[in-house]
Design a protein with these regions (language model features):
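Proline/glycine-rich low-complexity loops and linkers
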Residues: 1-23
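Acidic, glycine-rich active-site loops and adjacent beta-strand->loop/helix elements
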Residues: 12-15, 53, 158-161
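Glycine-rich phosphate/pyrophosphate-binding beta-alpha loops
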Residues: 15, 120-153
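Carboxylate- and glycine-rich phosphate/diphosphate-binding segment that chelates Mg2+/Mn2+
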Residues: 20-129
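A general structural signal for well-ordered alpha-helical segments in protein cores
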Residues: 67, 94, 134, 153-154, ...
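Short alpha-helical scaffolding segments that buttress acidic/His motifs in well-ordered protein cores
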Residues: 70-74, 115-123, 137, 157, ...
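Gly/Pro-rich interdomain helix-loop hinge
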Residues: 144-223
């Protein structure tokens, strides 16, 4: 086995969790495609996660990378491969990110610290179980339109959550709870699923993520769908 060079990772954004995952992405600019590569030998040998190193991020980058981290946590929690240990990581990550991202965008110390921890925990979870179609579609939007990855994830996540809702059992109740929604135990299945989706969408709006991607053309839809498959 050919191992990569030893790497000490010091992340400067709170989103991808590249410092703790076995995944990396290669973009083919000519074919307008992104390829996800998975290799346990590509993990850093040491990760130094210091929120002070993230404090220079502008608001837009803080918001988009933070929503990427939230997408990791929610998709990891609802993927078919999820199990008890990864559920523990993902729910805690959702909780931390939900309470931290707004203040991180405002460059508050507590928010930066929370996001540094939340994205790291989410990475520990999804690296073991994979992600979902929000990410596959976000990769396609990034490859074709150069949409920032976190922005694409944030735009796709509520839509995908709604699409997947009937296949998630009671998990959206715990997502809603982790997002800070009150009274979820008194809600019907339909109510807590809607509450979870609405809370995610509202967080995205609150941190300034756009809700529309005007670059998409109807003629591109077949290619986008095939690329995201």
């Amino acid at each position: 086995v050919n191992r990569g060079m030893p790497v000490i990772a010091l992340p400067t954004t709170a989103g991808t969790a590249a410092e703790v995952t076995i995944n990396y992405v290669i973009t083919d600019v000519e074919r307008k495609r992104k390829f996800v590569c998975v290799d346990p030998h590509d993990m850093p040998i040491i990760a130094i996660v210091d929120p002070d190193m993230m404090s220079s991020m502008p608001k837009g980058l803080t918001a988009s990378t933070g929503m990427d981290a939230l997408t990791h946590a929610i998709e990891g929690y609802t993927t078919k491969a999820a199990w008890e240990m990864t559920d523990m990581f993902h729910l805690k990550a959702i909780e931390i990110i939900a309470r931290s991202l707004r203040s991180a965008v405002a460059n508050e110390k507590e928010g930066r610290e929370g996001m540094a921890l939340g994205e790291y925990i989410a990475g520990m979870g999804f690296s073991n179980v994979g992600l979902g179609i929000a990410h596959s579609m976000a990769h396609t939007l990034g490859a074709v339109y150069d949409t920032p990855h976190g922005v694409a994830c944030a735009m796709m996540l509520p839509i995908v959550m709604e699409y997947n809702a009937d296949c998630t059992g009671e998990k959206y109740r715990e997502i809603a709870r982790a997002m800070g929604v009150k009274g979820v135990d008194d809600m019907s299945v339909e109510e807590y699923r809607k509450a979870a989706i609405d809370a995610v969408a509202q967080l995205s709006v609150d941190v300034g993520i756009p809700t529309k991607l005007e670059a998409i053309k109807e003629d591109d839809l077949d290619f986008l769908a095939e690329s995201a498959h």
